[in-house]
Amino acid sequence: MPASKSLPTALLGLALACPAMADAQSMELGQVLIGAEETSGEDQAVEDAKVRLDQVAGGTNLVDMRRPLQGKVASNQDVLAYQPGVYAQSAGNEGVKISIRGSGINRAPGAHASGLYTMLDGLPLTGPGGTPYELLEPLWLDHVEVLRGANGFDRGALALGGAVDYVSHTGYDAPRLQVRYATGSHGYQQRQISSGQVLGDFDYYLAVTDARSDGYQDHTASQSQGVIANFGYRFNPNLETRFYIRHRETENDLGGRVTKNSIEHTPRAANPAYVSRDDSRDQPGSTFIGNKTTYYIDDDSSIQTGLVYHDYPMDLREGPNRLKVAYSDVSGTFDYKRRDTLWGLESRSTVGLRVTKHLPNAGASERVRIPTGNTAGYAPGTPIRNFTYQGSDTVLHFGNDLEIADDLWLTTGLAAIYTRRESAVTYPQSGGKTSMNDWDYAPRLGLRYQLTPDLQLFGNLSRSVEAPHPWSLIYSSNIRFPAGSGVATGAQRDPVKLQNQTATTLELGGRGDSVIGEWSLAWYYAQVRHELLSVLPDANATTPYELNASPTVHQGVEASLQSNLWSAKDGGKLSLRQAYTFSDFHYRDDQRFGDNRLPGLPMHYYQGELRYDFPQGFFAAVNTQLVSKVAVDYANSYYADPYATFGATLGYNAPKGDWQTWLDMRNLTDKHYAATVTPGYDDKGLDAARSTPGEGMAMYVGVSWSLL
């Protein structure tokens, strides 16, 4: 598909030309996609986030939710659109596959995410078992901060993909009352009512949200409902605290993975096995309770502490057996920040501690749901196995930014990490147990140079560390209960040991403003050891194995450009925003696969939107997404096809900011394509069921009203 190569190439050329064309206009540095074209003076949280991200010696993104909310926003696919370096695609529900710099490259959509450290309002959401998605309700968000790769170091993030912080509204930036409703194709409906206010030294934000959809693919109906509340209090100018509460329930029918032939000819068809079993994935009620307290010692130093309780059970009916999973974590954080003078040079230091631990009840119970194979002859509900998931992550990190010359900052850092993982089969009694613990380290060295007010260059060399999930220790085992073990015959018996994944990454890049627009550009190269890769043993499997790979390479380019193409005398404006991600992930002389590409992600990923804003508040936009082919197995014997989709939006933002309406039209050509790929080992060139279909042509309409 020539277009999928020419547009990203043109974008990259423009971004490379930006330093030469930098003009003298003042600017705010950083990758920022703002919401409505006017910046609200009351949204100080977004402005503060821009300043923080400007000071990072590496690639970052800032998403102001005012822009995505001018269209359908149902999942992370909508929140993280048009973000360089971020791949986010949905399998038709909230279980979005997210990858940054190849993190969780072959994780299946709907599973707990890997390779990213995810936060809610700066507090840990990610636990030893990965990152659940059900609490990531987009309508609750004020903005999202993304620190790609090792650039999440000062947040305590040591994963390959970096850190993502979902920041919710508070009483300081929310309307006193807001009502939002959206509806559209495939039975989609979304409703929310929210309120936020500042009452003296106290403020609050409260929202109730629900959504439901029949789904594009057969047997992918979903529904959800949830509530969020946070309450803040300022005791005095030096001391403030905020409590956070989130609770949400989701139910998702599963259509399963299908073949390329099925997507081409019957794109809405589900995998027959999933339909016959009535497979589903329910989160019956996830709860997140946290507190963050900040004490400003003086104008130059502060201490912030955080505490979280996170309970997230699951009811998985994803095969012939039923798995009820209990997950509960507790987390604590401590951060000390200081700005002072070191050897006569301006210095900014951070010392942080992050601890997350599974509680003793974490584990799973597996029972017969549909008697078949080794469970034939046993009644539904018969216990098969009980097993435990235990783990903890402890990260102590120190970072410093030192201005060693005018506008030249040296970044140094060192983190120590202690990880513990344990899994045991407690029923039947002949089950095994595996326990692992490991100390590791992650240094960081970087430079950031403000060459002109409109041009910043940066580079860094960093190390990342990621431990396996406890569940992968049992599901990756090839040691099974022998014949004669009753209903447990053939089930994994002894958990296995896996090594921590580590990587050393070099990053170079820059960001700035020029005559062609606001731009960002980053190149990175990572040598990864013991990469934790997942593989489905066969096309009918529902749970992947996870294994340590031979050495791999992750390298790529991340570029964005936001341009004001034309301004009319009456105040109208024509703008273009573009994001391009080049990803080259491959083995290094693997004994079986040589230098094969790692499957699951495209090499080229481009998104662009051309938009005209009328002075009266109306807007109209057209958009496109171009994606190259994707390998579906480690042997690279078969590929999902490249594709291009096109869409358009129309809407109106009232000048007073009190109401808006929009029409979001997607995939106008009704293109049939694979949205996500969950890799197999070696399909020998056959068209195996590895892909989930992307949404066909669809239209959505929405309206919101606010009492300001």
Regions found by a protein language model. Name each.
Residues 88, 108-109, 116, 121-148:
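Short acidic/polar hinge/loop motifs at secondary-structure boundaries
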Residues 238-246, 281-426, 450, 520, ...:
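Face-selective signature of the C-terminal outer-membrane beta-barrel domain
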Residues 343, 404-406, 410, 418-419, ...:
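Gram-negative outer-membrane beta-barrel transporters
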Residues 50-51, 76, 98-99, 116-119, ...:
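N-terminal periplasmic accessory domains that precede
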Residues 23, 445, 459, 504-506, ...:
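Conserved C-terminal beta-signal and adjacent last beta-strands/turns
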Residues 197, 292, 296, 302-308, ...:
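Membrane-embedded beta-barrel scaffold of Gram-negative outer-membrane proteins
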